[in-house]
Structures are given as C-alpha cells and as structure tokens.
Amino acid sequence: MSLPNPAELIRQMAVDLRAHLARRHISEPRYIGIRTGGVWVAQALQEAMGDTSPMGTLDVSFYRDDFSQNGLHPQVRPSELPFEVEGQHLVLVDDVLMSGRTIRAALNELFDYGRPASVTLVCLLDLDAGELPIRPNVLGATLSLAAHERVKLTGPAPLALERQDLASASAL
C-alpha cells in the first residue's frame, strides 16, 4: 500500500476546514501546531487557507501521561502562543493521530493558557488505533497499519510520509 501525498491531502483539508468553519460561523480562527509534524502541517494548511495571522506551537512533552514510562523527549522546547487562548476559536493541528494521547495532552496544556471558545481538531492522518474517544473534525486520510508499523511525517519542505517497521528496527 502506498502512502498518500501530504500536499494533496492538505489541499483537500483546506476545503474541508473552510466548510467546517463556515458551518460553525468561525471567521478568525487561531492556528496551533503540535511539534513537530503538526507545526509543519499547520503552516501548510494556514498557507492553503490564505491566513497570515500568527501561528502558535505546542510542545506537549510535559503534559503526556506516559512521561514517567517513556521519559522526556531529548528536544523539548517551550510552547509559543502569540495570542490569547481565552475566548478564541482554535484550530489544533497534528500530523498523525494514533492513540489520542498527544491530543489529550495538547488540550490539557491549552486549558492552562485559558478557556477557548472552541477547538477544531485537524489531523493529516488517523491510524485508527485510538485508545481515547478523540476524533478529528477535519482529516486528511485514515490508514490501517500492522501492529509493528508506524508512519512518520518528514519535512518541513517538502512534506513526505515514510513507513517505519518497528519489528525490523528492534532486530538491529
């Protein structure tokens, strides 16, 4: 099975996001990308939407519920939100939705900054392996992978998807 082209997915996601925002009567959303791949997707999506407003970035490393098991990611950076969260309509963007735990962590962090009017979740890929009841409002594609497979977004330009085989990586 070949992996989809991120640029094509993002073009369609922009169409779907416009429709979603119009249905909800949201005219000035604030974009937030989850590091790292979600930031790349958010930048491309915001460009496709013709929106030049400042974009926020979240690093959810300290908010993950598996922090004590997996340890801290070696490249933790501070989150940057160049706007108030309180009362804003937010578009939260991630590259790959798997268990839902990254999104849960992102929502926890966002609410530490204030109470948004709404959060629209946008994901490039859903791996259909959810452990939490989290579903994107706008989705590029759903992929079903074997238990030993993962997908990684590379970028920032051009964006590309690569399949990773955890079984062969652990055999090394």
UniProtKB/Swiss-Prot annotation:
Its EC number is 2.4.2.9. It comes from Pseudomonas putida (strain GB-1). A motif (PRPP-binding) lies at residues 90-102. The keyword Glycosyltransferase applies. It is an enzyme of class 2 (transferase). This is Bifunctional protein PyrR. SUPFAM superfamilies: PRTase-like (SSF53271). Pfam families: Pribosyltran (PF00156). It catalyses: UMP + diphosphate = 5-phospho-alpha-D-ribose 1-diphosphate + uracil. GO terms for biological process: regulation of DNA-templated transcription. Regulates the transcription of the pyrimidine nucleotide (pyr) operon in response to exogenous pyrimidines. GO terms for molecular function: uracil phosphoribosyltransferase activity. Belongs to the purine/pyrimidine phosphoribosyltransferase family. PyrR subfamily. Keywords: Glycosyltransferase, Transcription, Transcription regulation, Transferase. The keyword Transcription regulation applies.
